[in-house]
Amino acid sequence: MDKKMFCFQCEQTVGCTGCTGNAGVCGKKADTAKLQDELTGALISLANAVDGTETISKRTGQIIIEGLFTTVTNVSFDNAAIENMIQKVRAEKERLVPDCSKCQDPYSSTEEYDLQQLWNANEDIRSLKSLILFGIRGMAAYAYHANVLNYEDAEVNQFFCEALSKIGYEESTESLLSTVLKTGEINLKCMALLDKANTETYGTPEPTDVTLTVEKGPFIVVTGHDLKDLQLLLEQTEGKGINIYTHGEMLPAHAYPFLKKYAHLKGNFGTAWQNQQKEFDHLPAPILYTTNCLMPPKSSYADRVFTTEVVAFPGAVHIDEKKDFTPLIEKALELGGYKEDQTFSGINGGKKVTTGFGHAAILSHAGTVVEAVKAGAIRHFFLVAGCDGAKPGRNYYTEFVKQTPSDSIVLTLACGKFRFNDLDLGEIGGLPRLMDMGQCNDAYGAIQVAVALADAFGCSVNELPLSFVLSWYEQKAVCILLTLLHLGIKNIRLGPSLPAFLSPNILNFLVENYGIAPITTPEEDIKALMNQ
């Protein structure tokens, strides 16, 4: 059977080999997947043009970042929007090197890279290039959010070009492996940049209880990761009798002092992204998608879906760069919300969740933590973090957290936490055993905590009683994994399945050099990790 498309960038790809039919598991159609490939080829061509001019401009950098972010899973399903992005990339390349077609140098040729060359390449080369490509796609999301807050890093921007050029033309396994690890290195800088942007703009996150009750009356649900969009919506809805509720990865917004000052930022609705079609069914309120993860909406709420920034879906109302949320506000007033307060619960029945244990909050108790470890009150730390998803087997993470010993601390971040963030695990020395550090990009904070603990005990991070148990779904998880590899973190447990884009040889390299292993059962993994 002829392949109508090829995509294997997410954890749920068909048969753990790749989506090749009329549509991907994520819902994007074959023609959309082909346009994403075409956009990536155009970005490689633009990157080669930048290589020729040596220094990347802010304008070019932002276009590359926007283009890469557009190709992340569950961001854009709109062919017209992707086609516009392709033309934007091509126009920028033409602006930089209008006479490029006369040059014989393959790094500056106007002929765009055909991604079929990558998908049909030697499996080890394809694997390494895929790690780089999916890594920079994830990193582009973080760079994009930082740029929205007027923070950027020239080294980060320049690396996007370097990495894209390597994807297009490098065939040396050694060079590609070096670039894989460098992707992790630069992503660490990118996450640090976003951490700085968020905290300098909105304040340092502080531990905050968040209700799961939705009050009666008009409301809007905001999902995604973009704090700036939430801020602007809060400003425009203030005093209008409309409450705002976060969803998914927007939950940590409640911990930022600047955003907490808005009294109508009430609580959190729903859980992780993969449950949205059930949770939003007949919802009497509109939903604003600021970033991924968007799923094709059901007819029962399709008229309530609003997108902004790079998120797009055919037929959905798109809020452009002017950020006039009037259509969203009018829809909220029209729908009217619930007639009475509605009390919802987390996956395990909890009525509230707590967030805001960022690296600053945890390290403010560093002395207490160190003494608790020395006294034997804390025997182990687990970072149970990453993406959630729909594939069976992800209840592993719920059971893992439930079964962690009472003398251990569980740190978490990203949307995978919704599997267990409503659990009450008790406290150790006044500190909760379960601490939510924030969004997926707050993996930077987890790294800072690990490094600080290692310094306090005079050892390496790998020598700490600390284990990484990660779940993955899309490309931001890939760049975070590469950052951990860059830092030399070993013995990571990864699931629910291993990436389809890892060839046997590359997977074996990661196993032999970093001890990466697939998850097994909570009981077996806890026992093994506690004894390492």
Task: Give each language-model segment a name.
Residues 43-201:
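Electropositive, gly/pro-rich neighborhoods at or near active sites that engage anionic ligands
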Residues 2-32, 36-37, 41-45, 54-55, ...:
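Anaerobic metallocofactor- and corrinoid-dependent redox/one-carbon enzyme cores
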